[in-house]
């Protein structure tokens, strides 16, 4: 059997390395490995979510809820929007992007992504026959090149992806830039990825009440600590949400994911503490790594940061390999379009792990 032509031409998406892989490859104890490659929450999930999951396990022989009104309302309350402006995805934010593509993308459409940015947009939309058009992220000034995006728009443009804070640079996009792009292009869907917005303490959610062509992606994998439960959500005008619900899989959110999400959202103290600890770790890492002359550390408003390592004498692959041998996983950014072979990305960890990581970096560079 031959797959569709587009599938034959695609490369597989390669996520960051797991602790199991590194433990096996380098004969290390899995529990001693510091994982900084996947932008996860290192502080664990909400205790209330864990308790709720335990209670719900007895019901997993039954299909999950098909109507998610209670969770939709909790997400609406958390986000400060109407319930009709919320859609929930059961495979993290990736399902939200996938349903967006199924709803709005026709074969031959184009979508714009500034580089570097999250690579999964391209991976998903190409499956539906859309063609990526690359705009620029100004790395020297570490900001979005808005003119590059505006100049790339044509009558085939269907979507523009704006990640804020941007992955992997950690930089916020000015609300004015989003407004300028959206207001001049009412027939183009502006997809604003806010997966990490809590760490920046900035959101563009009010724009969905002003613009019918703005869609905001969010996730519960980061601050909420539910990466393993796979739950994302989106915010937009009610019309867009209604269209998406027509084709969204009915039972994509598992029973365990549902109760985990619901109880995490109700655990306000957990959310506040998770944000505070994440920001504390980020600032500690930035301050300590910035003291190392050979590293070019980008300031970040997320739970990760981009680091240029050209002056170390290592390529990203070489540096990542040396760190892995000592039990540290970072993201080698060589595969990120828009970056060369001298960039890595690290995510936050506990303060104990932060200090251990700094010592290992100094050891590798000495």
From Swiss-Prot:
Record GO biological process: L-histidine biosynthetic process
EC number(s) recorded for this UniProt protein: 2.6.1.9
Keyword Cell wall biogenesis/degradation among record annotations: no
Enzyme class of the recorded protein, top EC level: transferase
Residues recorded as bearing N6-(pyridoxal phosphate)lysine in the entry: 222
Keyword terms: Amino-acid biosynthesis, Aminotransferase, Histidine biosynthesis, Pyridoxal phosphate, Transferase
GO molecular function, one term: pyridoxal phosphate binding
Cofactor (UniProt): pyridoxal 5'-phosphate
Pathway assigned in UniProt: Amino-acid biosynthesis; L-histidine biosynthesis; L-histidine from 5-phospho-alpha-D-ribose 1-diphosphate: step 7/9
The reaction(s) this protein catalyses: L-histidinol phosphate + 2-oxoglutarate = 3-(imidazol-4-yl)-2-oxopropyl phosphate + L-glutamate
Family: Belongs to the class-II pyridoxal-phosphate-dependent aminotransferase family. Histidinol-phosphate aminotransferase subfamily.
HAMAP family hit by this protein: HisC_aminotrans_2 (MF_01023)
Protein name: Histidinol-phosphate aminotransferase
Source organism of the structure: Methanobrevibacter smithii (strain ATCC 35061 / DSM 861 / OCM 144 / PS)
């Amino acid at each position: 059997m031959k797959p569709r032509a587009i599938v034959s031409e695609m490369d597989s998406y390669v996520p960051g390395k797991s602790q199991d892989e590194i433990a096996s490859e380098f004969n290390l104890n899995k529990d001693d490995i510091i994982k900084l490659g996947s932008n996860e929450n290192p502080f664990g999930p909400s205790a209330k979510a864990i308790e709720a999951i335990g209670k719900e396990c007895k019901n997993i022989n039954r299909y999950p809820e098909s109507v998610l009104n209670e969770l939709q309302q909790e997400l609406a309350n958390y986000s400060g929007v109407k319930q009709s402006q919320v859609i929930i995805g059961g495979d993290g934010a990736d399902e939200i992007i996938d349903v967006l593509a199924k709803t709005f993308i026709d074969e031959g459409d184009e979508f714009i992504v500034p580089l570097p940015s999250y690579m999964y947009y391209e991976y998903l939309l190409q499956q539906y026959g859309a063609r990526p058009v690359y705009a620029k992220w100004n790395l020297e000034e570490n900001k979005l090149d808005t003119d590059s995006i505006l100049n790339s728009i044509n009558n085939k443009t269907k979507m523009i992806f704006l990640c804020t804070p941007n992955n992997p640079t950690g930089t916020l996009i000015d609300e004015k830039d989003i407004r300028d792009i959206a207001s001049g292009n009412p027939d183009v869907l502006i997809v604003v990825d806010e997966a990490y917005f809590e760490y920046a303490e900035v959101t563009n959610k009010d724009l969905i009440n002003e613009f019918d062509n703005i869609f905001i992606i969010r996730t519960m994998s980061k601050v909420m600590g539910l990466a393993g439960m796979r739950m994302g959500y989106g915010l937009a005008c009610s019309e867009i949400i209604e269209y998406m619900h027509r084709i969204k899989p009915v039972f994509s959110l598992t029973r365990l994911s549902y109760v985990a999400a619901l109880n995490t959202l109700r655990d306000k103290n957990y959310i506040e503490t998770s944000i505070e600890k994440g920001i504390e770790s980020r600032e500690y890492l930035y301050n300590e790594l910035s003291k190392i002359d050979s590293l070019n550390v980008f300031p970040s408003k997320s739970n990760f940061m981009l680091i240029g390592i050209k002056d170390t004498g290592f390529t990203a692959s070489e540096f990542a390999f040396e760190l892995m041998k000592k039990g540290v996983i970072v993201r080698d950014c060589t595969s990120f379009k828009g970056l060369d072979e001298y960039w890595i990305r690290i995510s936050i960890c506990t303060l104990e792990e932060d200090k251990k990581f700094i010592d290992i970096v100094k050891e590798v560079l000495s």
